[in-house]
């Protein structure tokens, strides 16, 4: 319950910031274009706080925190007095209306650059993307990837840490091939470029990582069988496991690596497992019944809410991504461009069917991401805000009526035919666009629930 509440609070904060940025873009440009703004609202529904500013605009925070809006004076929906006609949105020139509508997404992109700029100036801990394990006969093994190699680039884009590697791999979902530039972990010798055949790459984001589906895992420090965390009210606590216990046997088999424990728990949802642990020099036998979690396609795995002791990272594998003021700005622009490219690429692949609808995420996934990154720290939360802000900006530019991109599409048509698109056509477009948007939202929310 505590995690759910924390995720909800972080989600509300994140959404409030991003919606405020987006709507402020519309508001600010509208005011600069001479349009009267009647209301600026964060959220929908009944207002829980509001005030009228000196400019005559009503500023409001509403009960439903799933968006916001800017209400401008508009002759299409209100009777506008003759003396205020020049301040109505619909009376503005085509370029002014286009500027007002496009300002929301543009401000989202600018905010992302600002957030990444802060991230790179503050600095974020990172580890070198060194390969730890390669599964025999996997796609990675066939391409010649080996343990100890450091991934320098994915398809020519530098990858200083695992986050950038993961972004690069995800960007190739649905492609036939990609290249990975590698070197030894010590940096000795020349870099090698490996071509990865992706035709047999079956990647389900609900069950594994992109690199796991390719057949390799990151290097991780030694993981012992000693428990350092037992979640309250979890299956491990109910079984009597305690922090400090060392797992010796699972179902009578000696435990040589922690992965054996993970495999046993995941393969026994709601089924008893005999566990022997060492506690204060004594051997203790327990019965663990893992809880169950349903993944995609009805697959059910077990989980117990326990975590092992992990050794410290070697010093030569750790570093901090931190730069000066001006270099951070350049890095922020570069990072934002990479995220934009990845998001646009994924949208295209979604449209043509190269990427399945099960990759869509909704508000529950966003809330979990907000809570997790906020728990890690301010700089991680900032990075999350930048990522979601870019996605929000791009989604709003999709040419579907009801979105900013739909309005811009109507304006483009108006520029060609030299008259506004007929109201009936716009109304039909809004209905079709609304149906598509709500259908995609339903799929995204369904995906969220399958991942719980």
UniProtKB/Swiss-Prot annotation:
Its membrane topology: Multi-pass membrane protein
Predominant cellular place of this UniProt entry's protein: membrane
Entry-linked Gene3D superfamilies: 2.30.42.10
Necessary cofactors: Zn(2+)
Record: residues binding Zn(2+): 22, 26
Alphabetical list of CDD domains matching this protein: cpPDZ1_EcRseP-like, cpPDZ2_EcRseP-like, S2P-M50_PDZ_RseP-like
Location relative to the cell: Cell inner membrane
Catalytic site positions: 23
PDZ domain location: 197-292
Molecular functions (GO terms): metal ion binding; metalloendopeptidase activity
Group of enzyme by EC: hydrolase
A Pfam family assignment: PDZ_6
GO CC annotations, alphabetized: plasma membrane
Spans through the membrane: 98-120, 378-400, 428-447
Keyword Transmembrane on entry: yes
Gene Ontology biological process terms, A to Z: proteolysis
Domain of life of the source: Bacteria
EC number: 3.4.24.-
Entry keywords, A to Z: Cell inner membrane, Cell membrane, Hydrolase, Membrane, Metal-binding, Metalloprotease, Protease, Transmembrane, Transmembrane helix, Zinc
Protein family (similarity comment): Belongs to the peptidase M50B family.
Entry-linked PANTHER family: MEMBRANE METALLOPROTEASE ARASP2, CHLOROPLASTIC-RELATED, REGULATOR OF SIGMA-E PROTEASE RSEP
NCBIfam families according to UniProt: PRK10779.1 (NF008046), RIP metalloprotease RseP (TIGR00054)
Name under which the protein is recorded: Putative zinc metalloprotease VC_2253
Record organism: Vibrio cholerae serotype O1 (strain ATCC 39315 / El Tor Inaba N16961)
Organism lineage: Bacteria, Pseudomonadati, Pseudomonadota, Gammaproteobacteria, Vibrionales
């Amino acid at each position: 319950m505590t995690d759910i509440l924390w995720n909800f609070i972080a989600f509300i904060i994140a959404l409030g910031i991003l919606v405020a940025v987006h709507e402020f873009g519309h508001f600010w440009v509208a005011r600069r274009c001479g349009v009267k703004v009647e209301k600026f609202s964060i959220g929908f529904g009944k207002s829980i706080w509001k005030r009228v500013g000196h400019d005559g605009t009503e500023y409001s925070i509403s009960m439903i925190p799933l968006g916001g809006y800017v209400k401008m004076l508009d002759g299409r929906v209100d009777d506008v007095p003759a003396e205020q006609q020049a301040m109505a949105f619909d009376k503005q020139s085509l370029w002014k209306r286009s500027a007002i509508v496009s300002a929301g997404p543009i401000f989202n992109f600018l905010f992302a650059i600002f957030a990444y700029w802060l991230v790179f100036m503050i600095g974020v801990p990172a580890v070198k993307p060194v390969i730890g394990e390669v599964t025999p006969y996997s796609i990675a093994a066939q391409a010649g990837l080996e343990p100890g190699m450091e991934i320098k680039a994915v398809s020519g884009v530098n990858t200083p840490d695992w986050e950038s590697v993961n972004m690069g791999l995800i960007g190739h979902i649905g492609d036939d091939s990609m290249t990975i530039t590698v070197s030894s972990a010590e940096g000795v010798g020349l870099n090698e470029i490996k071509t990865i055949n992706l035709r047999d790459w079956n990647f389900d984001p609900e069950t594994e990582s992109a690199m796991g589906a390719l057949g390799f895992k990151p290097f991780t420090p030694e993981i012992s069988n000693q428990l350092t965390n037992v979640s309250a009210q979890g299956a491990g606590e109910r079984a009597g496991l305690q922090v400090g216990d060392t797992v010796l046997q699972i179902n009578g088999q000696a435990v040589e690596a922690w992965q054996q424990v993970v495999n046993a728990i995941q393969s026994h949802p709601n089924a008893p497992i005999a566990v022997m642990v060492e506690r204060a020099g004594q051997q203790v036998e327990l019965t663990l019944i893992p809880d169950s979690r349903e993944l995609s396609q009805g697959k059910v795995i077990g989980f117990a809410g326990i975590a092992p002791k992990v050794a410290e990272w070697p010093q030569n594998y750790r570093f901090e991504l931190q730069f000066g003021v001006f270099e951070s700005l350049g890095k922020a622009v570069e990072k934002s461009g990479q995220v934009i490219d990845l998001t646009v690429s994924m949208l295209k692949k979604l449209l043509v069917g190269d990427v399945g609808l099960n990759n869509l995420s909704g508000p529950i996934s966003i809330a979990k991401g907000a809570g997790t990154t906020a728990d890690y720290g301010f700089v991680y939360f900032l990075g999350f805000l930048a990522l979601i802000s870019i996605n929000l900006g791009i989604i709003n530019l999709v040419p579907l009526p009801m979105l900013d991109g739909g309005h811009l599409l109507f304006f483009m048509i108006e520029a060609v035919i030299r008259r506004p698109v007929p109201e009936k056509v716009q109304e039909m477009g809004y209905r079709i666009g609304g149906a598509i948007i709500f259908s995609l939202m339903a799929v995204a929310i369904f995906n969220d629930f399958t991942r719980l």
